[in-house]
From Swiss-Prot:
Keywords: Cytoplasm, Gluconeogenesis, Glycolysis, Isomerase. It comes from Shewanella pealeana (strain ATCC 700345 / ANG-SQ1). Substrate binds at residues 11-13, 181, 220, 241-242. This is Triosephosphate isomerase. PANTHER family: TRIOSEPHOSPHATE ISOMERASE. Its EC number is 5.3.1.1.
Amino acid sequence: MALRRPMVAGNWKMNGSAQLAQELFNKFATKLQDDSVEVVLCPPSIYLESVRQLLDENKETLNGCLVRMGTQNLSQHDFGAYTGEISGQMLKDSGCRYVIIGHSERRRMYGETSNIVAEKFAAAQKHGLTPILCVGESGPAREARRTFEVIAEELDVVIEKNGTMAFDNAIIAYEPLWAVGTGKSATPEQAQEVHAFIRKRLSEVSPFIGENIRILYGGSVTPSNAADLFAQPDVDGGLIGGVSLNATEFLSLCTIAMSA
């Protein structure tokens, strides 16, 4: 069985502040003892420089702990007249290692199709960023028992454009739309069932990738349910929304992941 290092990624969405970043780093020094968990902060782009400075200033106090910087979106284009967009190269230059791709809010609110998501996935990897690819079904799709069908379709578009081996440098986040921001989380059994399906589907085309890719769960993860979720054999951590804005609770999730 592969040894997959747990990851806890905080998606601040359009929230947070430079003060929140400082509060998190103050707690990292006391709560994170080693590299057994990888922590990723994904603030709004305006705060990337603040987080980067804190990473530089706290190298010694972090003492080998894996705290990385990510972002919430990128353009599928390298450059050009795309007002308000940020390219993969710009994000790489800012110090980002990860980028969230295909979050349900981007798909729903901004009309990002699976083809656009696949293009953004490719753009991220072209510029040395690791995509965190979000997939997940709506409430009606789950009720119609179409969960696996929806997720397979979302994965297949990315595979068709980028090839299976592109997942050798990628993270997948299962975020059921009916659990994102609703306070209603998937049960550990529901999460495990879908994570196992994702791993099996990738294993069919590449056993190595299927075994080694990290699959996060996202959707109303809290300190009260994280231990049971993270204990599932195919759940490798979480993509965290609201709780990532509370330094104490977010660090609780990190420590839970360390012992999962």
